[in-house]
């Protein structure tokens, strides 16, 4: 579990648990700051100390390996997992370079040191300043409240009103500062991943160019660099979308905090001052408590908490409420007081004081006091305003008209669906489309009056205006679960299953839309709208959450993944029935058991394989590599164009642990454990092929393990090699696990495939065989000899 999201609505409650979450975020940023300072120091050692370069590299590599990113929420995307694991990959590169060290030019100041210093000073330094302001304002706010609440009720009304106004102004200023600080904390937590990894990427690229035999090494690194750049760009794109949503939510809560409160199990909660009576002659004292009341059980909880004493929780007290009575002005010299009586202590009222008259009335209503206010203290989900759009025959007509116009006139327009139209024109077009008579007369395919971006914006606006998102509130959580876990194949199966649980009209409209988006993505070389970019645009549109919270916004990236899966697997999901044996959504989060890892990946003895096998980018066709973006002026920060990127890869999960098989590796971006053969040192190319870490694409995309998982030790006794004959000649074999080829020299196959003429390969851990007339390499532990 990562860091908990900081909800803006909690800024107004300022509960003890909210303060605990803030401290957790602050501690993580301080840890990041210390780490970056240490990393900068290590980088300077590399520049200035050529003679001690080997030691400095080891320290630098160790620092990279030990640091782990924290994340907000309960899961990460595949891109974030690869970014998290990238530091481990960089560490492996450094360790490998130590044995091949050559005299090289160390021009890393501009590419590494300055960006890190800039990030630490401008971003982390800004958070420190915000923290100082926040702590200072907290002290000032609660000191003023303490002082204000001691004012006698017998003072002149004008004096009291002036004091009330001053306190209220101070509280509003405190809330403003709290909102800004919470927003900044979460922004930095999300920003630091790509802001930190990008300078590292530049550093490695620059360093390799200065090696005597860096040409072959750079080929290996370039492939990983390309994948990581895509991961970073995807994460950045999602961050931009998430940031705009967070800012919008923050502004909504700032404008009307009471109406934006989240659903809660408590009818009322907040701070109250409780009068604690002492023996004569000491009188009484007022102690601040955080109080919670559940009306259904009539249970009242209160916990002493003082913001200025380190924020430590005191021993709480709970009792069942008997009654609540408003305290009259002549019975106490304090304002906003009322009495509550516990069921187990009859006749012994407890006097408490609210922060204001309004809060006292709210507490009295919630507790069943005499003065009731028609305003519930209980938090509730804020209903979304419903537009005129409906999922009816007219809605299907609007959808088909817009799609037909887009595919006829603008399928190759750059930034399709990301470049937004003029708001007034979009609203006018949508109004015309929703009028039956005008809709029939409107010809969008041949009309030059309506720009393509106006049509696409109207289509998106129609989908957003539906009373319920196309993928429904009911199934929203179920769609998110498989996007957070499981292998790509299990994700597709889960979403396939859930799509067929949608109401028939929803499924039909979703089918039409996704088919269109599939067509749009097929023209991505012209319009730059890859599947990932379309996911960013349509994720929030098709899967908006019922309750707007920071936690829901953090799930936006997983909504995007769901839409990507729909686009990539349109034919399977909408044209075939789901597997009848597939479990209910409650089981979707469980990952399937892994098959054993490939022997060759664990052993790392690849000297007999061609270099090209481990430099997959050598054989990429020109059209397969992502093209850089041409930036068009964006209409909004969220709709700016982004680098096209591939999405979820193959449908077969990586084999994992099975009985006496080898232990599974740490993950698709994790370590590649190598065993160095006892012979003369191999050439640079051979050595790189032995030690080259597995790139993200070289793993048949499977269940993404946690980046914190350490690889199991390689045990020779557990090797599958011991269970097979030393020499296999002219045998048959059956596949016991599915596999997708990583190179043209390897075979792809499904479970149950029969191989002919199977022989032992020159590479340990691999066999050679023939399948459907094609001969190639087979992972030894994926098959069973017949």
From Swiss-Prot:
Residues in Rho-GAP domain copies: 389-574
Name listed for the protein in its UniProt record: Rho GTPase-activating protein 10
Quaternary structure (record): Interacts with PKN3. Interacts with caspase-activated PAK2 proteolytic fragment PAK-2p34; the interaction does not affect ARHGAP10 GTPase activation activity towards RHOA and CDC42. Interacts via its SH3 domain with PTK2/FAK1. Interacts with PTK2B/PYK2; the interaction negatively regulates ARHGAP10 GTPase-activating activity. Interacts with MICAL1 and WDR44; complex formation might transit from GRAF2/ARHGAP10-MICAL1 to GRAF2/ARHGAP10-WDR44 complexes.
Notes on the domains: The BAR domain is important to associate RAB8A (or RAB8B) and RAB10 to endosomal membrane to promote tubule extension. The BAR domain is also important to recruit WDR44 to endosomal tubules.
Site (Arginine finger): 418
InterPro entries for this protein: AH/BAR_dom_sf, BAR_dom, GRAF2_SH3, GRAF_fam, PH-like_dom_sf, PH_domain, PH_GRAF, Rho_GTPase_activation_prot
Every BAR domain range: 7-262
The PH domain, residue ranges: 265-372
Keyword Acetylation: no
Source organism of this protein record: Mus musculus (Mouse)
Domain SH3: 728-786
GO cellular component: a single term: cytosol
Known tissue expression: High levels of expression in brain, testes, liver, heart and kidney.
Function of the molecule: GTPase-activating protein that catalyzes the conversion of active GTP-bound Rho GTPases to their inactive GDP-bound form, thus suppressing various Rho GTPase-mediated cellular processes. Also converts Cdc42 to an inactive GDP-bound state. Essential for PTKB2 regulation of cytoskeletal organization via Rho family GTPases. Inhibits PAK2 proteolytic fragment PAK-2p34 kinase activity and changes its localization from the nucleus to the perinuclear region. Stabilizes PAK-2p34 thereby increasing stimulation of cell death.
Segments of this protein annotated with the region Disordered: 584-609, 622-714
GO MF annotation, one: GTPase activator activity
Compartments where located: Cytoplasm; Cytoplasm, Perinuclear region; Cell membrane; Endosome membrane
Comp. bias intervals (Basic residues): 599-609
Modified how: Phosphorylated on tyrosine residues, probably involving PTK2B/PYK2.
